[in-house]
């Protein structure tokens, strides 16, 4: 979504349904597919070991996808020069962010045999994912030549939600008294879901139609059919001088209140498991091996009581902060007089952009430098360099064209890695088609 306080210089616009904005991105900090599967003579087990131990608990994996379903807007206000713009639309978003559960990974990879006495931190499990639709209406107001500000209200409808961010506890193996080892659990784990239980319970009549039924059910939740929430975006644009521009915005300052189809799974308590005694063939009990191991399984399951509750919960959106400062220069020179056109815009722009998004453990930051150039009257381009938690060598490129009243834009990141995407820690692509009706020149 754009800054709601961005300047708008057209009379009205309408997005081509399902094509006005398409965005997809995925990233993993600290590791790439190439690190695990490169044909470089290193054994896969060694590559896996390096990944398990080298990644930090603050490393993360993220996926984001957006699809604008409908969008539009129009200018209004002063009949001579409208100074307000009303925008509206509906879009779908998938967002998932999971921290690397380091102690869980080490325990799964190495087991506890070589980690006697080590305390495994169970709070390493931290992540959330959501599939939502967003209905929004915004108003942008141009106060004067220097200041423009705007607000956008949002109604969220949650299709699916998963959340596990407040886990606590530990696991440690020590030498035992009645057996070789004691396994000590101190558990306070919670996994919250909404929209999932009804999908799992969908009837399957044996014709492999579960997927079709699930899609149909999710479609019902797109507009006011799921758990609802409210959000707010606000932003501004300021020109301290003619060629300088400063912008700022806060987006998705909001929440979703989950009351429908809610299930929360909890595992709490302190437990000690002393392992099993060996089974000897002539123990005189008459118990078979299968019966013995079933008893062990039952005892272990009784030790851990997984509770399922249907308590309402609030899921806060991940707020986003954007800021930029830029400088424009180089007006078009007219051949007829070898002078600049007074009513033309600048051809070049350079600047810095800052982005931050709130996450459950700590914010995620990125900073970008960019150069913008109007190549032709109908085509402009933009080159960016971004440093963030994924990479320090992220170079992106974007193009925007205006042919007639149709605008098309496309932008991609991490161009240097496109020859082998497996090496990339992050990749993103966005594009869109919109119909724009310009202001009449006075």
Give the positions of each predicted feature.
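Subset of outer-membrane beta-barrel
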Residues: 1-442
């Amino acid at each position: 979504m754009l800054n709601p306080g961005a300047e708008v210089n057209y009379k009205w616009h309408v997005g081509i349904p399902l094509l006005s904005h398409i965005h997809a991105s995925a990233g993993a900090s600290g590791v790439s597919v190439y690190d695990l599967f490169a044909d470089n003579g290193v054994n896969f087990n060694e590559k896996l070991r390096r990944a398990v131990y080298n990644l930090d608990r603050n490393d993360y994996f993220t996926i984001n996808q957006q699809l604008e379903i409908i969008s539009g807007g129009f200018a209004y206000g002063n009949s001579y020069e409208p100074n307000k713009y009303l925008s509206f639309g509906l879009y779908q978003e998938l967002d998932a962010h999971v921290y690397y559960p380091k102690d869980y990974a080490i325990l799964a990879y190495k087991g506890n045999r070589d980690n006697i006495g080590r305390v495994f931190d169970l709070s390493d499990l931290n992540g959330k994912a959501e599939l939502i639709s967003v209905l929004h209406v915004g108003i942008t107001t141009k106060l004067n030549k220097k200041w423009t500000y705007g607000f956008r209200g949002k109604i969220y409808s949650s299709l699916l939600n998963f959340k596990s961010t407040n886990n606590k506890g530990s696991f440690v193996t020590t030498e035992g008294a009645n057996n070789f080892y004691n396994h000590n659990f101190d558990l306070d784990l919670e996994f919250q879901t909404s929209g999932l239980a009804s999908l799992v319970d969908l009837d399957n009549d044996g014709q492999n139609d579960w997927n079709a039924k699930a899609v149909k059910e999710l479609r019902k939740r797109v507009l006011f059919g799921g758990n609802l929430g409210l959000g707010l975006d606000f932003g501004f644009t300021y020109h301290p001088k003619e060629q300088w521009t400063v912008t700022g915005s806060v987006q998705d300052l909001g929440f979703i209140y989950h009351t429908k189809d809610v299930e929360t799974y909890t595992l709490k308590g302190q437990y000690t498991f002393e392992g099993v005694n060996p089974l000897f063939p002539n123990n005189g009990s008459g118990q078979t091996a299968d019966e013995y191991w079933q008893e062990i399984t039952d005892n272990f399951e009784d030790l851990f009581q997984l509770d399922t509750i249907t308590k309402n919960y609030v899921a806060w959106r991940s707020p986003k902060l954007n800021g930029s400062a830029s400088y424009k220069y180089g007006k078009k020179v007219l051949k007829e007089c070898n002078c600049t056109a007074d009513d033309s815009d600048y051809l070049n722009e350079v600047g810095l952009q800052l982005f931050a998004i709130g996450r459950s453990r700590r914010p995620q930051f990125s900073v970008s430098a960019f150069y913008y150039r109007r190549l032709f009257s109908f085509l402009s381009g933009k080159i960016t360099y971004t440093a963030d938690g994924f990479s320090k060598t992220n170079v992106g490129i974007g193009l925007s064209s205006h042919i007639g009243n149709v605008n098309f834009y496309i932008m991609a990141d991490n161009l240097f890695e496109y020859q082998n995407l497996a090496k990339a820690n992050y990749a993103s692509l966005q594009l869109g088609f919109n119909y724009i009706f310009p202001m009449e020149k006075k």
